[in-house]
């Protein structure tokens, strides 16, 4: 499911070419959702919290000083929720989370162009700073969100998507990663 609560809608962008080009393309399928600081975020899939950091202030504009929650799924992939607000983690390391459970509050920590959620799913991990994008775990996989329509081929940058109620899960389009 989209990483925010049903009924809410946000504009989505692909991450900047600076990010993907500077890291060998490992962030190819990362998404940025424009949203105000403090927006409740939910787990796109069930899993176990693999990493948490929420100590940096919003607006620090410093690379590798972003707050995050990372959730490892049963298939070994890791969803990353980045740029959270200070004290914005609502879960702790090792917690089991349900799909749709509130896990964090969005923010503007780290090097950003404004408040947003950076969301991606990596093949393994978690990779922690400063090794965020090291291969093989830095490689992201394409995802679709079953509670956002239309998006059979993934979300389209520049469009606003609303999280719908009902069938809510995220599926990986990569052939080696099963749907959730």
Positions of predicted regions on the chain:
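Acidic, glycine-rich catalytic/binding loops that coordinate metals and/or anionic ligands
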Residues: 1-4, 13, 92-98, 120-180
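Short glycine/threonine/proline-enriched tight-turn/helix- or strand-capping micro-motif at secondary-structure
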Residues: 11-45, 52-61, 66-68
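A residue-level detector for short acidic-glycine micro-motifs
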Residues: 14, 51, 83-86, 105-108, ...
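Catalytic cores of extracellular degradative/oxidative enzymes
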Residues: 31-36, 101, 115, 124-128
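A structural signal for short beta-strand/turn segments enriched in small hydrophobics and glycine
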Residues: 41, 47-49, 94-106
């Amino acid at each position: 499911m989209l990483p925010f609560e049903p009924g809410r809608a946000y504009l989505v962008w692909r991450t900047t070419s600076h990010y993907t080009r500077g890291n060998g393309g490992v962030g190819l399928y990362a998404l940025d959702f424009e949203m105000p600081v403090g927006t409740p975020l939910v787990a796109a899939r069930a899993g176990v919290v693999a990493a948490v950091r929420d100590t940096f202030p919003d607006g620090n504009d410093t690379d590798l000083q972003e707050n995050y929650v990372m959730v490892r799924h049963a298939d070994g992939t890791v969803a990353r929720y980045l740029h959270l607000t200070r004290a914005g983690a609502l879960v702790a390391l090792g917690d089991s989370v349900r799909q749709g459970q509130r896990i964090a509050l969005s923010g503007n920590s780290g090097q950003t162009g404004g408040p947003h959620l950076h969301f991606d799913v990596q093949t393994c991990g978690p990779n922690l700073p400063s090794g965020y994008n090291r291969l093989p775990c830095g490689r992201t996989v394409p995802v679709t969100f079953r509670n956002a329509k239309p998006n059979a081929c993934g979300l389209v940058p520049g469009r606003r998507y609303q999280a719908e109620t009902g069938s809510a899960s995220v599926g990986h389009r990569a052939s080696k990663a099963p749907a959730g």
